[in-house]
């Protein structure tokens, strides 16, 4: 649907990129892999580069005093009736432009000049700084109204209205695609496709346990099956009779093994997140971990509402009910930027400003948390233990 931009969102390792690759041919799009170090101008520059432009710094400056860039692109012009034989010939013409990379009108003009018509995929959009995401949401409206260009934005979050919050003018101009939800039948279908490809069959009890232990994470299901195949000596398609796999293997133990390999990353997340951007009297980022580390896995799976977060924090924080709710809101809105500043990748938390809900967007973290001594984790970051 080129009439609207598209967002593909969901938790980490839930198949967002696979979905995009499945639906688009390589020639249908250009891919821009986002970086947490980019400004809006950097993002726009990378879009132009992937579209075929060569960029060099100009001697002229923008009205803000920043250097403009010279952009050049080669364009193939097909003409009919060559001198010999009357067949089609191709002439290469060069376009030379001077651009302000922070001006969306210049970017649209450059892409139109290059006769660019592919989809533009922005992968890992959540890695961009919050202010860059917000600024680009403003640009998206201009792309929608002043061009036929279509963006496909892929990121780790669970709020289908994330970009609309950044720019209300995008209402009705974005198609959100939720790639987070995998039900049991869909996970079974994933396993079955692998079984058919390898000419094997997993034992039913193994399949059921793998799905149950995965918390709905398709990567964990696939990795569990992969390790079961390795332990059974299956590294390629079985020739002849279909082979049974999983007999004598414990799917839950394999899942625990996969999660345990991430233990260092999850422990580092807790300690690094607790330290916040800097030391403050209220230590709000540390206290934001309190409702996470004291809630049940079921509660965390559904997401923690602002009301429940506030209730849990005020029940344990030294200032109690005198704590200003604005401090909690401010900490919640900084969830993503704090993780990026601490190089926590992939991110583990995301705050849904539409529904005022804090989500765990790394399902592996939920499984890991279910295996931990919560009081030990609380003690590690100086929070009161559960009674």
Residue spans of the language-model regions?
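P-loop NTPase nucleotide-binding core
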Residues: 2-121, 127-134, 148-149, 323
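An amphipathic alpha-helix signature
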Residues: 41-48, 184-188, 192, 207, ...
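Residues immediately C-terminal
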Residues: 127-130, 142, 159
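Substrate-engagement module of ASCE P-loop NTPases
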Residues: 139-150, 331-338
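Conserved small helical "lid"/interfacial subdomain of P-loop NTPases
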Residues: 179-207, 215, 219-224
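Amphipathic alpha-helical "lid/sensor" segments that cap RecA-like P-loop NTPase cores
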Residues: 203-261
